[in-house]
A protein has these predicted regions:
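Short, conserved phosphate/pyrophosphate- and ester-handling motifs at nucleotide-, phospho-/glycolipid
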Residues: 12-13, 65, 92, 180, ...
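Post-nucleotide-binding-loop coupling segment downstream of the phosphate-binding loop, primarily
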Residues: 2-10, 14-77, 260-262
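Surface-exposed helical/coil interface segments that assemble multiprotein signaling complexes
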Residues: 108-111, 163, 190-240, 245-406, ...
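Mid-core helix/loop region of P-loop NTP-binding domains shared across ATPases and GTPases
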Residues: 43-49, 59-90, 95, 169-179, ...
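A conserved switch/coupling segment of P-loop NTPase cores
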Residues: 18-28, 71-143
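Non-catalytic, charged helical/coil tracts that couple and regulate nucleotide-powered enzyme cores
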Residues: 50, 54-68, 112-114, 120-239, ...
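Cross-kingdom leucine-rich repeat
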Residues: 79-82, 87-88, 110-111, 332-342, ...
Length: 761
């Protein structure tokens, strides 16, 4: 048992996360889980979170009925799962002793050298939690002067040294941060935007810190530093920054969700030559550059996927939001609302109706983790006709909310991850200002013709992924859209539309959607290939395209495309290709390319190897040949490569200086492949090598015991796994656990590895 304690922002989570993510640490444990403990968490939810992560880590199905289990039952399941396993569990940001008391009985002490770590702001909790196990308490201290200076300069001057004429000013400002890393990073974000030649600007910042920062309270000092960061924001960014207060603590914010919400709220100013989405991305980039928001996850091609706000930053944002009557956060049923409320974010439980509170000015209503559904009319009996944002994501909703019919000003409607099945035409047709309709992971399969009345609609997401184990051909449910979809001229995202309807009319209509950035098509017929290509040629702003044929053996004919969209970055093709479209070679911006069930007769690598920005390539049953050759000096930017179900593949060769940036290689279900790629030892940047259901004959060639003649070729790769789909879950074995007879499946079962990437636009 190890407890790490210290004030908020001192780096407890950062330190423990660095240890937790270290491959040399993780290889010692069979199961690992990181659980973030929110300030208002419930014990049952905490245990469910721990259980789900553990089952996910060892790739086992989650037990049925877990959502309704009591805490005692959950503890028993977790304890049984971890019994006789060496595990590592981290509880981040524990606030109360009873939280630790509740979960510790679920963690068995089987003398397997397991480790439990907690981070907490409370030193008494840190001490008391370690008494029983004679554990250790690590009281994290502020950075030393030289460490703080190094961090400050790295963030302020992007790795360069501080100019001599600014040293005194910078050291004065740095002293006010008192070694608190979060404060240092925040103020560095402000200073990094300043002209290094204007000493007067820097001196003004130095003087504006004010007398309050000289107090003894470290939180007060940090508030002052953050106020400086906030006050330095351009006017258009202040609302965007305050908007982060609506999300719960430790919530992973989806980048595109935030972008669309900002636009719906009216925070994004239009600029000539740019869409509002482009401008919003510029806003986000500036907040990231100022270190006021953190990247939580990225895609394989380097795009920001999720974001988060440090909890201490969030607390101060909430205070500012409250002071300015910007938004109200409700966490308890009895919580009183302000007299006038503009934005309401409900976390965990719906508030009681407050008859005497006016919501006539309510602009936005969002719910997070709410376990019950109450119709809007009952929740707000006095009316809410000015609502522009209604976010019901993950709500226990079964029917389309009828009250929406009166929301003429509504711009953003999300029913994602609900059980809604239909969209009433007489209701949706009234929402003339709607810009985003998010029905992802619902049961909606058709949009009514009334949708064509929504001329401002920019984003339509109506699809559901169905993944279990290996990718299946029909892994997505899309939607039937009105054949005259081309009337929605403002559309930027349309996913996923079934194309085999109305005699291909919808295919011809797609060319009218000149603003499209992302397009997903299902069930494209071979005979519609020419019409589809003519439409795609007109979509010059397209960044991502996903096309799936009617069936695994059905042909996608894209050979008629002469001028592909010049900015295409992501291309996903599922279905038989008689030949690889030659225009793919001209896609200089292409970063991700997935080819599934292509069954090409000729080696596609020859046509793909010179794509200058290709970072992620996935090939599933894409080629019928027996050899794949990655030529020397080619695929210069490739970072992720997946090869799956090549039925005839017998040999893979990697030339010298090929794929010099490759970090992850996955090879699966290639039954005739009996040895690892020749030249794999040249892939010096490779971090992960994973085999999926590959023959034992291949695995024995890299076995550390016995006849493993190729073991030395993969010795430089930190993580080598052999993975098998068994009984509805993934069994994962590390190379160094293979048994003496070199049978990977008789080795030691370890934690799960990163799940296979989904195919999406």
């Amino acid at each position: 048992m190890i407890s790490v304690t210290g004030m908020g922002g001192i780096g407890k989570t950062t330190l423990v996360k660095k240890v937790y993510d270290d491959p040399d640490v993780k290889k010692h444990f069979k199961a690992c889980a990181w659980v973030t403990v929110s300030q208002s968490c419930k014990i049952e939810e905490l245990l469910k979170d721990l259980a789900k992560k553990l089952f996910s880590e060892i790739r086992r199905p989650i037990p049925e009925g877990m959502e309704s289990m009591c805490s005692d039952k959950l503890k028993m399941i977790i304890k049984d799962l971890l019994q006789r396993k060496r595990y590592l569990v981290v509880f981040d940001d524990v606030w109360h002793m009873y939280e630790w008391e509740a979960v510790k009985y679920a963690l068995p002490n089987s003398n397997c050298c397991s480790r439990i770590m907690i981070t907490t702001r409370r030193s008494d909790l840190a001490f008391n939690s370690t008494i029983e196990s004679s554990g250790k308490v690590y009281n994290l201290q502020p950075l030393k002067e030289d460490e703080a200076w190094d961090l400050f300069c790295r963030n302020t001057f992007q790795g360069d040294s501080c100019p001599s004429y600014l040293i005194d000013i910078c050291k004065y400002i740095l002293r006010k941060c008192e070694g608190l890393p979060l404060a240092i990073v925040a103020i560095s974000g402000v200073l990094a935007t300043k002209d290094k030649r204007r000493i007067d600007e820097w001196d003004m910042i130095c003087r504006s810190l004010g007398a309050e920062i000289q107090g003894n309270g470290k939180l007060d000092n940090f508030k002052t530093v953050l106020n400086l960061s906030f006050n330095d924001l351009p006017y258009h960014l202040k609302y965007c920054f305050l908007y982060l207060s609506i999300f719960p603590q430790d919530y992973l914010i989806q980048r595109m969700r935030l972008i669309r919400l900002w636009i719906a709220e009216g925070f994004v100013e239009a600029k000539e030559g740019k869409t509002k989405e482009d401008v919003a991305h510029d806003y986000l980039k500036e907040l990231l550059n100022r270190n006021l928001i953190q990247v939580a996850g990225t895609t394989s091609d380097g795009r920001v996927k999720t974001l988060r706000v440090h909890d201490l930053l969030r607390e101060i944002i909430i205070l500012k939001s409250k002071d300015q009557n910007f938004a109200s956060i409700v966490k308890e049923q009895s919580a009183a609302w302000p007299e006038k409320i503009r934005r309401l974010s409900v976390h965990g439980t719906l508030p009681y109706r407050q008859q005497h509170r006016s919501v006539s000015q309510l602009r936005s209503f969002l719910m997070f983790g709410v376990g019950e559904y109450v119709p809007l009319g009952k929740l707000f009996p006095s009316g809410f006709k000015l609502l522009s944002v209604l976010d019901y994501q993950d709500a226990p909703l079964k029917k389309f909310p009828l009250a929406v019919i009166d929301l003429y000003h509504l711009r953003y409607l999300s029913l994602r991850n609900t059980k809604v099945k239909t969209v009433p035409g007489h209701i949706i047709g009234k929402l003339h200002n709607l810009e985003t309709l998010d029905l992802k992971n619902t049961s909606v399969r058709e949009l009514p013709v009334d949708i064509l009345k929504l001329q401002k609609l920019r984003h339509v997401l109506v699809y559901q992924f169905k993944f279990k184990g290996y990718a299946q051909f029909h892994s997505k449910d899309g939607l039937k859209a009105p054949s005259e979809i081309g009337n929605l001229k403002a559309l930027q995202k349309l996913c996923f539309v079934e194309a085999n309807q109305d005699c291909g009319m919808i295919i011809r209509q797609l060319g009218e959607l000149s603003q499209l950035r992302r397009l997903g098509i299902l069930k494209l017929r071979e005979e519609d290939g020419m019409a589809f290509c003519l439409s795609i040629e007109r979509l010059t702003n397209l960044h991502a395209l996903s096309v799936t044929s009617e069936g695994e053996s059905k042909v996608i004919d894209l050979t008629f495309l002469c001028s592909p969209p010049p900015f295409l970055q992501r291309l996903y093709l599922s279905g038989r290709l008689q030949e690889l479209p030659c225009w793919i070679q001209s896609l200089h911006s292409l970063a991700r390319l997935f080819l599934k069930w292509s069954c090409l007769k000729y080696d596609p690598l020859v046509y793909l190897q010179d794509l200058p920005n290709l970072a992620h390539l996935e090939l599933l049953q894409a080629y019928d040949g027996d050899t794949l050759h990655f030529r020397s000096g080619k695929f210069k930017k490739l970072k992720v490569l997946g090869l799956d179900k090549f039925d005839g593949l017998k040999e893979v060769t990697v030339g010298k200086d090929a794929m010099t940036r490759l970090e992850k290689l996955s090879i699966g279900r290639c039954e005739l492949l009996k040895k690892v790629p020749s030249g794999i030892e040249n892939l010096t940047k490779l971090k992960v090598l994973e085999f999926f259901d590959m023959p034992d004959e291949l695995m024995k060639t890299i076995c550390p015991h016995g006849p493993g003649k190729d073991y030395g070729k993969v010795l430089h790769i930190p993580d080598v796994y052999s993975t098998y789909w068994r009984d509805g879950g993934w069994d994962v074995y590390a190379l160094d656990t293979f048994s003496r007879d070199c049978s990977p499946r008789s080795g030691t079962l370890i934690r799960s590895h990163e799940p296979r990437i989904q195919w999406k636009v």
